[in-house]
């Protein structure tokens, strides 16, 4: 990297490379030794020193048979060069140490069952990336993606997002969950339907749509805010619900039924239109791999 030092009027005075070469020559008192240390040919070192002397309109070194010695102006420049180079190096280091952030938006359900293992795996591969996960409803996710507050969103809503690029579309297995006392699909209809209180929730839409295809009367509905609340209520005999199969791992007092006529859902990953999709391929691959594991 070559840093440019400007004067007050914006004109170029010198490049930091010239200052670094000047400092090395001042330290070694030798053009040849400086060239060796910095990996340049001697003529290149000499050319940079002469260019610097022309820009400053002064002589910086006295040449003699044993090497070079700083002039008074050379000593003055060395003092300033040390400070300038130190400041440039600190500035560069501060940017290099500034952690890259990845701001992810998703639904509460996906954040709870899919992302934890994916985040662990991503951090193993990219330990210097700071991850931030926000759980929002679908409308808020799209809005924050469009205004730059999120880098990518992971959702199971299938409609297109005009200001995003889709890089993942992978199916998820859904199952109808019932209390353990429900041993047959014929018994399902006697239970209340437990759904997420957010109307845009895909599982809610699929479950109610399926119910309305098979029953003339609307179900008794219980609306809850969290997946955990839905699971606990089903386990205690309070009703039936629809959730991804993986959510049921190690859950007791719950039966599950796979019903072919239920409309499926998919996990979609969208990145903002001003982002490079290639930067998010690693996260996409991890999510896709985890979905394959979960769906088996």
Question: Which residues make up each language-model segment?
Answer:
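A late-sequence structural motif
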Residues: 259-296
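Short helix-boundary/capping micro-motifs
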Residues: 23-41
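A short LG(V/I)-centered, amphipathic sequence patch enriched
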Residues: 22, 53-70
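Alpha-helical linker/hinge and terminal dimerization helices associated
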Residues: 55-56, 77-98
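Acidic, Gly/Pro-rich loop/turn segments at junctions of secondary structure
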Residues: 136-191, 246-251
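Central regulatory/effector-binding core of bacterial HTH transcription factors
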Residues: 99-161, 223-224
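Hydrophobic hinge/microswitch elements
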Residues: 137-138, 156, 208, 213-260
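Secondary-structure junction motif
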Residues: 192-214
